């Protein structure tokens, strides 16, 4: 049984940086990790992929020979992979004892309008891999209410169309207030609290006023499903990464892979309860310059707390 992550999200959200950083962190705590590059247009790969779709099909050749644009060429490449899954299976099966990270393309339509990625993942699951989909979004989108609603809609669409455990991530948390303070506390964005509070901010901007009814209708759909939430992440902060890994391991079952007795499950549940107490309070205090308690100061390196996570992650 293999375990891993499928990393998706819009262009510029930091997927490849996430894959590279996550791989380094997991290797540092003793896991064997392999990254699978499924993005045929990814020209600057900072890691050494164990499997690379570019060995199967060349994106630039497709674009030149078919006269397709970038998006059309990418869809062509992914459809070609879907028709040649035996190639992928042959590459993946020897890696079952590795923790697998799939670096996927950033074109949103692959997840919202096509079944290509979903079909590929369905087949990978049949090969005895247990996966969690990680949707990565730039925390910059929290700054604008309309942009925030758009990533909520993309998140919901991906969760509905790809039938796997999902975790949505707000990346680049260290830069979240680079363009000014946010309108709400962090938990409003991570837990997707009452979106009606966004109405006043949507009506403020004259450019968005004509879309006010549309935005409110979309917000209503998101609240009706009540599926979307986010985990904040700074990939350079080991405590932040460890928090995310704890959630991922629970969602795909990795956390239970080494259990010998039923009592160990109770120990894990107790530990999860302790970790989830005010789980994002520290992140808010650390990265929100406008946070109301200005006297609270946290050091970047919290080795004592991190050791507790390491004990769990090395199980």
Curated annotation (Swiss-Prot):
Nucleotide-binding is among the record's keywords: yes
Residue(s) at site: Stabilizes the phosphate intermediate: 71
UniProt binding sites for GTP: 12-17, 171-174
The keyword Hydrolase is assigned to this record: yes
Annotated motif Gly-Pro-Asn (GPN)-loop, positions: 69-71
A Pfam family hit: ATP_bind_1
Alphabetically ordered keywords of this record: GTP-binding, Hydrolase, Nucleotide-binding
UniProt-recorded Gene Ontology molecular function terms: GTP binding; GTPase activity
UniProt-listed InterPro entries: Gpn, Gpn2, P-loop_NTPase
Record function comment: Small GTPase required for proper localization of RNA polymerase II and III (RNAPII and RNAPIII). May act at an RNAP assembly step prior to nuclear import.
PANTHER family: GPN-LOOP GTPASE 2, XPA-BINDING PROTEIN 1-RELATED
Subunit text: Heterodimers with gpn1 or gpn3. Binds to RNA polymerase II (RNAPII).
Recorded family membership: Belongs to the GPN-loop GTPase family.
Entry protein name: GPN-loop GTPase 2 homolog
């Amino acid at each position: 049984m293999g375990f891993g992550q499928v990393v998706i999200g819009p262009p510029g959200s930091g997927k490849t940086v996430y894959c590279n950083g996550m791989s380094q962190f997991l290797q540092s705590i003793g896991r064997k990790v392999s990254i699978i590059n499924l993005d045929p247009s990814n020209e600057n790969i900072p890691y050494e992929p164990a499997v690379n779709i570019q060995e199967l099909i060349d994106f630039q050749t497709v674009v030149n020979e078919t006269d397709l644009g970038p998006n059309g060429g990418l869809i062509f490449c992914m459809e070609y992979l879907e028709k040649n899954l035996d190639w992928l299976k042959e590459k993946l099966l020897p890696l079952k004892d590795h923790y697998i990270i799939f670096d996927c393309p950033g074109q949103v339509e692959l997840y919202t309008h096509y079944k290509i990625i979903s079909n590929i993942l369905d087949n990978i699951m049949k090969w005895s891999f247990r996966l969690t989909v990680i949707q990565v979004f730039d925390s910059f989108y929290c700054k604008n209410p309309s942009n925030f609603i758009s990533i909520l809609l993309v998140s919901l669409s991906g969760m509905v169309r790809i039938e796997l455990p999902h975790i949505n991530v707000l990346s680049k948390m260290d830069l979240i207030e680079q363009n000014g303070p946010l309108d709400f506390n962090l938990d409003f964005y991570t837990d997707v609290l009452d979106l009606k509070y966004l109405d006043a901010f949507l009506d403020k901007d004259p450019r968005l006023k004509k879309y006010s009814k549309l935005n409110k209708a979309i917000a209503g759909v998101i609240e009706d499903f009540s599926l979307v939430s986010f985990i904040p992440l700074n990939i350079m902060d080991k405590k932040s990464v460890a928090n995310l890994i704890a959630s991922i391991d629970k969602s795909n079952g990795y956390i239970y892979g080494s259990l010998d007795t039923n009592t160990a499950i109770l120990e894990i549940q107790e530990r999860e309860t302790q970790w989830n107490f005010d789980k994002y309070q520290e992140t808010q205090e650390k990265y929100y310059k406008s946070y109301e308690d200005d006297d609270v100061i946290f050091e970047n390196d919290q080795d004592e707390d991190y050791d507790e996570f390491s004990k769990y992650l090395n199980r």
